[in-house]
């Protein structure tokens, strides 16, 4: 199912993998456990960092080849993704239980440093409340994503789903607590250059933008790369078309396998992110309301669709 070369790399990167499902401890959970530092989602949306699971039901399957992706892409190691067969997709109840079990196994590793973590925080981490379905791969390729989200909600979780927006029919169906669409290009040429996608994929993404106003809580995330897509005003028309609740402008980070495709200089500094956010603020319906220097990210809110950012 997963080529051995990719599996070995993912395991070396500390992915827990079971079938087509994977969990990896977010670096911010580690910082919260050991240094009591919160992630930007805590600052922006009020989540408890140490109680968040980072997972995917489709660990290596994605339609795009984004140059900024820190994950290993099949083409990075000479594998044609079209030659990798889709797995036999497991039922959502099975995937849910696997995600919880893998996450618990990771957190239990902190039992050995309980003096640094603290018993209260450790116990809370063993009872997660949030799940980010965003680790690797494209989650909408998992055919039971809607059912999986509902299972998480039934069990008291808030859900964050991050999608490339290609499968409009799936996006229309799902209702996570917060839906993220990654919009990293402003036209077909930039899409091909940055995301390595097909023309029909770009057209599908545009169709998805048109249905986002019907969703309960939405965010567009744009990963900015110096010299590739940092002319923020070229995005304004698409942002207005989507009419989402929030926009996150985030710098590309020179980590993981992206280091083989881009240079360190392609990252933007936080003051540059803020400058672009203020430019967007002055030229659109979206107003700058928060930022996080550690993550080089700025949050803007749609002044025509105001909701409380905090969950």
Curated annotation (Swiss-Prot):
Pfam families assigned: Radical_SAM, Wyosine_form
Keyword list, A-Z: 4Fe-4S, Cytoplasm, Iron, Iron-sulfur, Lyase, Metal-binding, S-adenosyl-L-methionine, tRNA processing
Principal location class: cytoplasm
Cellular component, GO annotation: cytoplasm
Catalytically driven reaction(s): N(1)-methylguanosine(37) in tRNA(Phe) + pyruvate + S-adenosyl-L-methionine = 4-demethylwyosine(37) in tRNA(Phe) + 5'-deoxyadenosine + L-methionine + CO2 + H2O
Compartments in which it is found: Cytoplasm
EC number, UniProt record: 4.1.3.44
InterPro entries hit by this protein: Aldolase_TIM, rSAM, tRNA_wybutosine-synth, tRNA_wybutosine-synthase, TYW1_archaea
Superkingdom in the source lineage: Archaea
Binding site for [4Fe-4S] cluster 2: 62, 66, 69
SUPFAM superfamilies hit by this protein: Radical SAM enzymes
Comment on bound cofactor: Binds 2 [4Fe-4S] clusters. Binds 1 [4Fe-4S] cluster coordinated with 3 cysteines and an exchangeable S-adenosyl-L-methionine.
GO biological process terms on file: tRNA processing
Keyword tRNA processing appears in the UniProt entry: yes
Enzyme type, top EC level: lyase
A GO molecular-function annotation: 4 iron, 4 sulfur cluster binding
Cofactors required: [4Fe-4S] cluster
Signal peptide start and end residues: none
Location of the Radical SAM core domain: 45-283
Cystine pairings recorded for this chain: none
Residues reported to bind [4Fe-4S] cluster 1: 26, 39, 52
Main function: Component of the wyosine derivatives biosynthesis pathway that catalyzes the condensation of N-methylguanine with 2 carbon atoms from pyruvate to form the tricyclic 4-demethylwyosine (imG-14) on guanosine-37 of tRNA(Phe).
Subunit note: Monomer.
Protein family membership: Belongs to the TYW1 family.
NCBIfam families for the chain: rSAM_TYW1
Protein's name in the database: S-adenosyl-L-methionine-dependent tRNA 4-demethylwyosine synthase
Organism (species): Methanocaldococcus jannaschii (strain ATCC 43067 / DSM 2661 / JAL-1 / JCM 10045 / NBRC 100440)
């Amino acid at each position: 199912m997963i080529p051995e070369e990719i599996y070995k790399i993912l395991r070396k990167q500390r992915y827990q993998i079971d079938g087509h499902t994977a969990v990896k401890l977010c670096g911010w959970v580690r910082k919260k456990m050991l240094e009591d530092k919160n992630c930007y989602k805590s600052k922006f949306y009020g989540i408890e960092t140490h109680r968040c699971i980072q997972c995917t039901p489709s660990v290596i399957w994605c339609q795009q080849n984004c140059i900024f992706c820190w994950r290993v892409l099949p083409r990075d190691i000479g594998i044609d993704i079209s030659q990798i067969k889709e797995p036999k997709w497991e039922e959502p109840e099975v995937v849910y239980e696997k995600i919880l079990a893998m996450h618990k196994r990771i957190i239990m590793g902190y039992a050995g440093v309980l003096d640094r973590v603290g018993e209260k925080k450790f116990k809370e981490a063993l009872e997660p409340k949030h799940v980010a379905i965003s680790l690797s791969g494209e989650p909408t390729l998992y055919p039971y994503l809607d059912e999986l989200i509902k299972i998480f909600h039934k069990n008291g979780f808030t859900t964050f789903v991050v999608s490339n927006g290609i499968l409009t029919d799936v996006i229309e169906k799902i209702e996570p607590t917060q839906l993220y669409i990654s919009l990293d290009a402003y036209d077909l040429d930039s899409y091909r250059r940055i995301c390595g996608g097909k023309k029909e994929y770009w057209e599908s993404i545009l169709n998805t933008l048109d249905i986002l106003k019907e969703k309960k809580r939405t965010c567009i995330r744009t990963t900015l790369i110096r010299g590739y897509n940092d002319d923020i005003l070229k995005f304004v028309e698409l942002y207005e078309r989507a009419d989402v609740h929030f926009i996150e402008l985030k710098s590309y980070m020179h980590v993981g396998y992206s280091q083989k495709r881009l240079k360190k200089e392609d990252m933007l500094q936080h003051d540059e992110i803020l400058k672009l956010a203020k430019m967007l603020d002055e030229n659109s319906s979206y107003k700058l309301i928060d930022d996080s220097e550690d993550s080089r990210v700025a949050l803007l809110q749609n002044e025509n669709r105001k909701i409380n950012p905090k969950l």
